[in-house]
Amino acid sequence: TQPNPGERFIYTNIVEVMGVSETQTKAVQTGGLGFGPFISTALEAGSSMMAIAPSYVRRGSPAEAAGLRRGDLIYAVNGTQLTTSNYRNYMTSLYQSPSGSYKFSFLRFEDNGEGGYSLNAYESGTAMSSVHIYDPVLHASILTDPDNSSTKSGYLVYESFDLNSQEFLEETIKDFAEAGITDLILDLRFNAGGAVAQSRWLSGCIAGAANYSKPVTKVVYNDNSTEDWKFDYGYSNDTDALGLPTDLGLDRLFVITSYNTASAAELVISSLKGIDFPVKMIGCRTEGKNVGMTVSETTYSGRRFQFSPVTFWVRNAKGWGDYKDGIEPDEYVNNDNTLTTDDADNVFPYSFSDWGNMDYNIALQWAYCDITGKTR
């Protein structure tokens, strides 16, 4: 269920810049263990023993190197059992994890070969909280229909539109193009936005060369001046330095969304709908951030600050941009209400297994079945 449906946010912000700013480096580094936010569960009814499962584990992170995956049920950290009295602290500390060395005891659902799953126990390697290269591609794979080998579906889980991580996105799109995918399932459930330029580039890959000259978005600034961006190069020839998109040869898009999906992620959906490119949304209503910020930096008393005031809002080719209350999906996996009994997946957008397991990734299963014509 969506926390606080209809809640509004103030997006303008001021932050102090510590160390090297993102605008001064090409390779973006991040710290910590590489976990996403956690979901919790009781290990057994009537017991105080708890487990927490990460929403994702970033590629190339210390947590991945230690053997952890999305959905693994961590029940002990450095030998300390998680209980009702301490698990919340671990949910916060492991997500932020500014420093430290960790070993995890965890359970993993695995195919038992009999049409079901076994819950198997594992011990991780040592994970040292450390600086590592940030990769917003949380998962990428190609799903092939065993009954029709010509049907190939690219599945991309993308966390953030980060210009300095463009190489990771380009590599994934190149792999999809070389494999000749016939459909794309774009999972934006944990994507809160980022650079409009990269959103434009990915939208162009999906829309294809036949639509390059069409408007991807109209940017309307606070003084009512406007910029018309196109799918090919954005505002003007190669302004954003990303170049022409890679034409994936698609004629539709399946996109998975949640209440985390916002800003530049919502722009992909809006821009494609603006040119009547078929988009099917599965998941739950998006956040509803149809405004953007321009980042500037200043120094005061020897300290550097970044100012990010809201300076523009966006409209698509049809003039539509009124999604401040979010964009509603075509099919709800998890309803925007306080109930769990009417949800197809009552822990969405979280999971207790890895990305590719459709038994635990209902949104992916629905998209895949729509593509292949199989029964859900």
Question: Where is each model-derived feature located?
Answer:
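C-terminal "post-core" interaction segments
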Residues: 154-156, 165-171, 175-183, 192-376
